Amino acid sequence: CAADLGVAVLHAQPPTPDSDPLDRARRQGLTALFVATPGLTGPVVIKHALSGNCDASHIMDTLSSVESAMSQLASPRDVERLDDVSDDQEKSVHRVGTERRFAPNSMRARAKTTRSLPSKSHVIGDSFLGPLIEAAVHRLDLEADSAHTLDGVDAMIHGQILYTLGQCVRHTQNTHEGPLFAQTVLEFASGSFFADSAHPHIRRAAFVTAGLVATSLTAIPVAMAYADRTPLSLALETFTTRASERHRADYDADVRAAAAFALSALAECKLRASDAVDRLPDDPIDHGTPQITTRIAHAPITL
């Protein structure tokens, strides 16, 4: 099946010492499988790669392929409309009898836009983000149980996991589950293992991920989160506090720079939310018309 094929492609080994061509082919093959059957291959291959039975190169290839697949799935795809009435299509259709067309001007205007641009970003959460967090938690538990000493390779892997999670949120920002995914990734990255890690590479990755999440959030969900004090607003405030502390006191210059990036992105996110609230009408009901407008309570948002 597709999942077994994905695992087999992941473990393909080069017949010669020159492994670069096969490495590229492996990543391209995994990306193609993730795009074609994300729900079948994504969870299985991610779980296998982070189970402890694969080396660092296999894990990095898997995460790189996941990122490439998400980029393709979230990109708009050109799909011809079924009701296209352009001139080219009319020439290939032989009509019998007399056709009556109502609202010809509207139909003619609609025919000018002959393509729609859907995407498959809605499958990213179940296919990649959820399995990746679950596999990462399992890997952390295995390392804790075995008293594993964190080295540079482990820090690189954990940092890439966080960055891939940030890309998951970025590619799902226009889905209705985007704010929930952002909250989940922020809560995961703000854990003490990442944000307070002894390894600076992991701390830096945590704050870069927070910045990616903050730049991906749209204004209205953030405004609603601050108005209702939902877990998303609490996660944003928690990361703002952590980033402020690390920006002031961390000994690593790269971590301080990453914390500054996170602070700037979080402040921009709050500012967009505040502007969105200010642009909404004060009265939820316009008595001059029968329409009802949406209103969000004007909760104070401190920057």
Regions picked out by a protein language model, each given a short descriptive name:
Residues A2-D84:
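Helix-rich alpha-solenoid scaffolding regions
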Residues N53-D55, I59, A69, D78-L303:
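Long alpha-helical repeat scaffolds
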